[in-house]
Design a protein with these regions (language model features):
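Structured C-terminal helix/loop/strand segments within mature extracytoplasmic catalytic/sensor domains
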Residues: 26, 30-151
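Active-site-adjacent helix/loop patches that line small-molecule binding or acyl-intermediate pockets
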Residues: 1-25, 35-42
Length: 151
């Protein structure tokens, strides 16, 4: 109720029912929630894929779970062709719509990619934002595969 400046639960639910307002809720405040950066998520994925984050069995389990991502409308949408494996995880809270993934083209080294966004609205489905996440991932992975990007 504090986040919506409401005095009753009914007032809070009424305020949150409007997707025209992007509330500044405590869930968006890094001091009160788990928070990370796209760079750190890419480092974590690189450590996982190289076997430096977990035990061998833990690594295989984590990779298998990420390969079974059930939402194909974000990063996966940037790679609609066969011969490409995308293992990822979405993260959505209100206006925050993120996804991290490892994209692997057959015969090539895997590429970690993280796309973090903040939408203007908190609608549960925002196809244009999801498609943009896929497009940004495609552009980033294409550049990394070209060998022209220097860290």
């Amino acid at each position: 109720m504090r986040d919506t400046d409401s005095h009753t639960t009914a007032e809070a639910f009424a305020a949150l029912a409007s997707n025209d307002d992007a509330w500044t809720v405590a869930a968006y405040d890094a001091a009160y929630a788990s928070a990370t950066t796209a760079r750190d998520m890419n480092r974590l994925l690189a450590a996982l894929w190289s076997g430096n984050a977990l035990s061998e069995s833990g690594t295989e389990l984590a990779k298998a779970l990420l390969h079974h991502q059930v939402w194909p409308h974000r990063i996966r949408s940037g790679f609609p062709h066969t011969g490409v494996a995308v293992a990822g995880k979405t993260g959505t809270v209100g206006i925050i719509r993120n996804e991290v993934a490892v994209v692997t083209f057959a015969g090539e080294s895997p590429v970690a990619v993280a796309v973090f966004t903040r939408a203007a609205r908190a609608d549960p489905a925002l196809p244009a934002v999801d498609a943009a996440i896929g497009e940004v991932a495609r552009i980033a992975v294409t550049e990394l595969r070209s060998g022209t990007v220097v860290d």
